[in-house]
Amino acid sequence: MNRRHFGLSATAAVLLAQQLRQALAQDAGRPASSVDRDSAWRMRDAATAFLESLDAAARKAVSFPLEADQRTSWSNLPVALVPRVGVNVGAIGLQSRRRLHDLLRASTSSQGYHKIAEIMRHDDLLRTEELEYLQHNPPRPRAGRNAIESMGSANYWVAMFGEPVRGKPWAWLLTGHHLGATFTCAGGRVAAAPLFLGAQPLEDLTGPYAGFTVLSHEGLRGLDLVSSLHPEQARVAVLSTEPGFSDVLTGVGRRDSLSRFEGLPAGDLDPPQQRLLHALVDEYVRNADFDAAERHLDAIQRAGLDQLHFSWRGPTNDIRSPFYYRIHGPRLIIEFAVQEPNHIHTIMRDPQNDYGMDWLGLHYEEHAWSAR
């Protein structure tokens, strides 16, 4: 286990480490329930149908070993800036795209599915807006032409790791501009972290869909929570009223970049404020299908809800202001950052089970033991 103390005293850190080891052992040792297995099998069946819809060349391009480094090398940048692996959504046939959406629906809740689908559709809007801007303002484009032309709903990529067959661990990845969605199945259980979601534009400002917002509640619920704090609580949680970080800190390859907890412990919130915190956590964790979400929420609770810390940087009275917040605990990292007006980034991670690593370790231990 990682030995960082998160700013705790040595005694408290030892106690927390013991509690975490116990919670992880309980989580890893709990057999998958029938609901877990049904959901995992539904995802497996959808993945199989997607693979069968591809031609031989695309099936080869989409398939990687489970241990391939590419499984953890997604990006949220435009494809022209960071090439992707797997198959391009725009290059596969209509039936394959439909099967891909079946797989995405099998892996997420209704809220998670619609967020991801709308992020992809919104990239079409962004591409159109940026190309129009470039046409009328060629001396100072906001983004390079190659990056702009690589935007759009067709420029997302999907990759499969391992084989989606019963009894074997496997995973799949959907990534592109403002999206990094990872799903891992091991032992009949599904892990849906890390999950990066971004939006640009956050809100449609013109046209027939003016007012439509992709990721509205992430910012609103965060603002509800910080606005509910009493002055003495705010002095601990609000680390600065100046503009916050313009991006998340725990993006791809940076899970361990946070060396300590910061801000206000959840145990110092009153019951109505704790309800707001739980609603905010649900807004992220429940993007996953219900079984994966419930298992993650249960792990967060067993690690100690009081261990969650809430911190805020930036103005606290304007949803359109450049603010940043974080929720951080032993089994959860949530970050929200306003990059620029009408442009946000979010990420959710499980420090102990990102990419299902804890469950995969247990699976291989059990497999090695049964082979003796």
Residue ranges and their predicted role:
Residues 1-14:
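N-terminal secretory signal peptides and thylakoid transit peptides that target proteins
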Residues 3-4, 22, 97, 274:
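A generic alpha-helix preference that emphasizes hydrophobic side chains
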Residues 8, 21-22, 236:
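Intrinsic structural disorder/low-complexity segments
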Residues 19-27:
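Signal peptide processing junction and immediate N-terminal pro/mature segment
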Residues 27-56, 60-109, 113-372:
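A cross-kingdom marker for long, charged
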